[in-house]
Amino acid sequence: KFEANENYYKGEPSVKNIVFQIIENADTAILALQNGEVDAYQMTPQQVKKLDLDANNLTAYSYSEGRVGYLQFNCNRVTDENVRKALLFAMDKKAMDDAAYESDEYYSIPYTFLPTNSQFYTEEGVEKYDQDVDKAKSMLKDAGVSNLKLKLGYISSDPVQSAQALLIQEQLKEVGVEVELAGGDATAVSNAMKDPNNEYDMYLGGYIMGIDPDTFSSLFKNGAAYNYMHYSGYD
């Protein structure tokens, strides 16, 4: 139970108390919302779509949580930069996000490591890798790559990652790349990603890192905790 801070710098809050109730099962939590046992619940777009809001006298609000979902390459395994670029050109980001989030009402596409709602976000000078299948095929050919097989790690219980993994497999097949879907539980996948000798070629994941861009340096720094792509950046 949390009590409002009467001395909050923007003025006294209108809500005096908030109680957070831990409900581990999503279906149980949604039922509690429908029955009026809880006043609010954070839901996925898929859950909202299945729920009759009017019949249950509920209102859905969307907001930007500053989360960035990503596909990362394991640079220890996919070592050729041009191959990585070719794979990016093979993929349709909008189709992947539509499949995962139902509607662009629930997402925006960031073209950098910063979320689009960051005051520091910019696309100036950024290569966007919008889908170009012919270019992807040409780049793979120029790199001397054929019959490429890749393993994709993702959290199998995450509906967003599961939907995106299937589309990645389908889209890369169009350029002659075979993708093995290697879904697992969150702990196992996360631990494997940290291991520089892991067998994943690509990973799906996401992060909420706050508003200070310096925080994001841990994604690129050599040996940093969140440099899951094992990119040789800087010390």
Placement of each model-derived feature along the sequence:
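A bilobed periplasmic-binding-protein/Venus flytrap-type ligand-binding module shared by bacterial periplasmic
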Residues: E3-E6, Y63-A86, A90, A99
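Ligand-site clamp/hinge motif
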Residues: N5-L51
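Ligand-binding "clamshell"
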Residues: K50-S62, N197-E199, P213-Y226
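Periplasmic-binding protein-like
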Residues: L51, T59-F73, V78-S118, G223-D235
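Structural transition elements
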Residues: F89, E105-D142, D158-Q161
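Ligand/substrate-recognition segments at binding pockets and active sites
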Residues: K141-M209
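Extracytoplasmic/peripheral linker and loop segments enriched in polar/acidic and small residues
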Residues: E180-V189, F216-D235
